[in-house]
């Protein structure tokens, strides 16, 4: 297998920490020019510093972007296009629970519901829509969406909007893969298991308590939690030419937690 990512231009959303940061590192290690964005400006600068320190000769550029604002997204994509002349890889990683914790369904407000959908699903739509004209013109491209095991089953933390929006992202993956395939554009999805990678997941882990933590790990075939690099390597596979005849697929990277056909 050759390094088919070298020299390509990759846009990664939600890149300020955790899985997003590790995806930036993995693609940079493989020779991609990385454009990383997030709404968290200082943490995003830390990502750039880490990539530059770890990867010799890395090209990691950062911009503060709110994925829920189409104007911000379009401006960012236009900037990348003008600077690089192309975009080869889009990773829609931005998402999360925005600090929310479990509430009974009747206690979930409209705003609670909408804000999670706006980040987890609308953000991926905004970015995919923005890059599509360029990818069509190029006649190729790879889009990788980051869903969750919650999108294939249910949320361990019980947050209804999170599970629903991540399931929607899997459907969005299939639909766009079908539509864009004739233009040489592949769209795939990674569904991570539980990864302690950012402040939200640390809060969720702590809130479980010792017994629930033990049950969670015992329910994973490989008997460990995931690491950000586990997810990043799956993303790199989908982004590479090793996956040239794969589209519309969702792979669970969860240590065997959900054994789905």
What are these regions (language model features)?
Residues 101-105, 109-117, 216:
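Substrate-binding pocket helix/loop in short-chain dehydrogenase/reductase
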Residues 4, 97, 101-102, 236, ...:
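Short C-terminal tail/terminal secondary-structure segment
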Residues 133, 152, 178-179, 244:
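Alpha-helical segment proximal to the catalytic Tyr-Lys
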Residues 181, 186, 246-248:
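Short, small/polar-rich loop/turn modules that mediate ligand/substrate recognition or access, typified
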Residues 128, 165, 173:
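Active-site helix of classical SDR
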Residues 3-35:
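Canonical Rossmann dinucleotide-binding motif of NAD(H)/NADP(H)-dependent dehydrogenases/reductases
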Residues 182, 194-220, 260-261:
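A glycine/serine/threonine-rich, flexible loop-to-helix segment
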């Amino acid at each position: 297998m050759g390094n088919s990512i070298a020299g390509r231009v990759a846009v990664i959303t939600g890149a300020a920490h955790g899985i997003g940061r590790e995806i930036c590192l993995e693609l940079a290690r493989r020779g991609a020019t990385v454009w990383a964005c997030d709404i968290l400006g200082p943490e995003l600068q830390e990502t750039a510093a880490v990539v530059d320190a770890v990867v010799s000769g890395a090209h990691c550029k950062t911009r503060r972007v709110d994925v829920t604002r189409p104007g911000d997204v379009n401006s960012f994509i236009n900037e990348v296009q003008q600077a690089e002349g192309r975009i080869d890889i889009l990773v829609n990683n931005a998402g999360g629970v925005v600090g929310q914790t479990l509430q009974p369904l009747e206690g979930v407000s409209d705003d609670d519901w909408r804000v999670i959908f706006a980040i987890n699903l609308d953000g991926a739509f905004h970015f995919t829509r923005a890059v599509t004209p360029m990818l069509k013109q190029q006649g190729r491209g790879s889009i990788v969406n980051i869903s969750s095991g919650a999108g294939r089953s249910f949320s361990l933390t019980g947050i209804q909007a999170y599970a629903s929006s991540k399931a929607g992202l899997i459907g969005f993956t299939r639909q766009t893969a079908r539509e864009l395939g004739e233009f040489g554009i592949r769209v795939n999805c990674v569904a991570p298991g539980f990864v302690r990678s950012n402040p939200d997941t640390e809060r969720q882990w702590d809130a479980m308590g010792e017994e629930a933590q033990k049950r969670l790990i015992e329910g994973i075939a490989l008997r460990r939690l995931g690491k950000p690099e586990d997810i990043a390597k799956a993303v790199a596979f989908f982004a590479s030419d090793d996956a040239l005849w794969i589209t519309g697929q969702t792979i669970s990277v969860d240590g065997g937690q959900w054994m789905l056909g």
